[in-house]
């Protein structure tokens, strides 16, 4: 089985790192709490006059590279490989890609090992990537093609209105994926 894992928000803890960076840069302005998030794009959860401040954080040199792993993500990645799954990291770089692209590779190397950089797929359109499952926190994924993969939503406050697909986090991933493996054998 070919499993595609999104990077930001699934493997790398973008959300909490953003909040920490916001508090350091703007201690006088309260950040939007993770549980209060409504939009996949973090800047859209801020008032228009604050969106530039938000964007400056996640496009800053070192931000993507220095993201901590989502708790349980590295262990799940390694366990999936040990189970014989073909696991790839499928990530969309930011439109402001100057720092992001290289830093995604550096993040993978730091947390998953140099060999894992061979498993990194960067694309603006995930529908063009082949796979059986895509685990992604983006609630709706559209593009040029009808994807072959089944979208499993990685749980986040901004995607909880989507109830038509399986949902997982790194605490329940074994149960959710066991159901998907059974489903693929049918």
From Swiss-Prot:
Cofactor(s) of this protein: Mg(2+)
Sample GO molecular function, one term: 5'-nucleotidase activity
Annotated SUPFAM superfamilies: HAD-like
Catalytic residues (UniProt): 6 (nucleophile), 8 (proton donor)
Key words, A-Z: Hydrolase, Magnesium, Metal-binding
GO biological process, one term: pyrimidine deoxyribonucleotide catabolic process
Family: Belongs to the 5'(3')-deoxyribonucleotidase family.
Functional description taken from the UniProt entry: Dephosphorylates the 5' and 2'(3')-phosphates of deoxyribonucleotides.
Protein name: Putative 5'(3')-deoxyribonucleotidase
Species for this entry: Bordetella pertussis (strain Tohama I / ATCC BAA-589 / NCTC 13251)
Lineage per the UniProt record: Bacteria, Pseudomonadati, Pseudomonadota, Betaproteobacteria, Burkholderiales
């Amino acid at each position: 089985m070919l499993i595609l894992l999104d990077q930001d928000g699934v493997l790398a803890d973008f959300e909490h790192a953003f909040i920490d960076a916001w508090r350091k840069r703007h201690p006088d302005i309260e950040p939007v709490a993770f549980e209060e998030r409504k939009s996949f794009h973090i800047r859209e959860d801020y008032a228009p006059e604050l969106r530039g401040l938000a964007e400056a954080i996640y496009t800053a040199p070192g931000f993507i590279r220095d993201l901590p792993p989502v708790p349980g993500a590295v262990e799940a990645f390694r366990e999936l490989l040990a189970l014989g799954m073909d696991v790839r990291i499928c990530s969309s770089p930011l439109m402001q890609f100057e720092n992001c692209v290289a830093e995604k590779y550096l993040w993978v190397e730091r947390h998953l090992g140099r060999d894992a950089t061979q498993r990194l797929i960067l694309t603006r359109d995930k529908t063009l990537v082949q796979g059986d499952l895509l685990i992604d926190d983006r609630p709706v994924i559209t593009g040029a093609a009808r994807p072959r993969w089944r979208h499993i939503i990685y749980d986040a406050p901004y995607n909880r209105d989507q109830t038509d697909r399986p949902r997982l986090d790194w605490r329940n991933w074994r149960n959710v994926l066991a159901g998907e493996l059974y489903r693929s054998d049918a």
